Design a protein with these regions (language model features):
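Core structural elements
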Residues: 143, 147-149, 154-203
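Active-site cavity-forming subdomains of large catalytic enzyme subunits
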Residues: 1-133, 137, 146-160, 175-182
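Intrinsic disorder at enzyme termini
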Residues: 25, 29-34, 189, 198, ...
């Protein structure tokens, strides 16, 4: 009871928190986090909290850590923050940073499957096959965007045909219109990898 299941839990960490942890200083947690006059605020020992985070990550693989300022600095969509692509959150498990009304589209390429002669002295990574499959994966993810657009258009048509009054339907219609705009303009895809540890082990590489 009271436990989160079916999702990875991540902690959103800013540079000033990490600096406070390094310097063993106190850090103010607050809500809303970007408010000049927060409705809730509490000071915590940053170093002690950081040790607790990394201990639990070591012990149970939870929580993940999202270095938020690094994400904002290095995220390609944040180059277009003035056009509405500023990163504000992630999908439930934290794999992909998202701007408002954007969608989580993920595909993982299994790195272990590209190891030839695994767990032998002749083990090697098949880079040519990997490059070929990554290109196919990206092409497929882009096609998924078009399928998503079709579904959103059907949802919008359904909203329009519903018998409810326009004042009732307006909120839902505007929501899906915003999602459609982000989908067609940004066309964000999330091609990632999995089984990195298995790949390294199969190649006899320590990490």
């Amino acid at each position: 009871q009271g436990k989160v299941t079916g999702a990875n839990v991540s902690v959103k960490v800013h540079d000033d928190f990490m600096q406070a942890a390094i310097n063993k200083q106190m850090y103010q947690q607050q809500y809303p986090i970007d408010a000049t006059e927060p409705s809730f605020a509490k000071e915590v020992d940053a170093h002690k909290l950081w040790k607790k985070i990394i201990h639990n990550a070591w012990k149970s693989a939870e929580p993940g850590v999202l270095f938020w300022d690094t994400i904002a600095r290095e995220s390609v969509p944040d180059c277009y923050a003035d056009l509405g692509y500023k990163t504000v959150s992630t999908n439930p498990c934290g794999e992909i940073p998202l701007c408002p009304y954007d969608s989580c589209r993920l595909l993982a390429v299994n790195l272990y499957s590209y190891v030839k002669n695994p767990f032998t002295a002749e083990a090697e990574f098949d880079f040519e096959l990997f490059k070929k499959h990554v290109a196919v994966a990206q092409r497929m993810m882009d096609d998924i965007i078009d399928l998503e657009v079709e579904k959103i258009e059907k949802i919008l048509a359904k909203v329009s045909s519903d018998p409810e009054a326009e004042t009732i339907k307006r909120t839902e219609r505007e929501l899906w219109e915003k999602i459609l705009a982000k989908t067609t303009q940004g066309r964000r895809t999330g091609v990632g990898t999995t089984a990195e540890g298995d790949m390294l082990a199969a190649m006899g590489l320590r990490y």
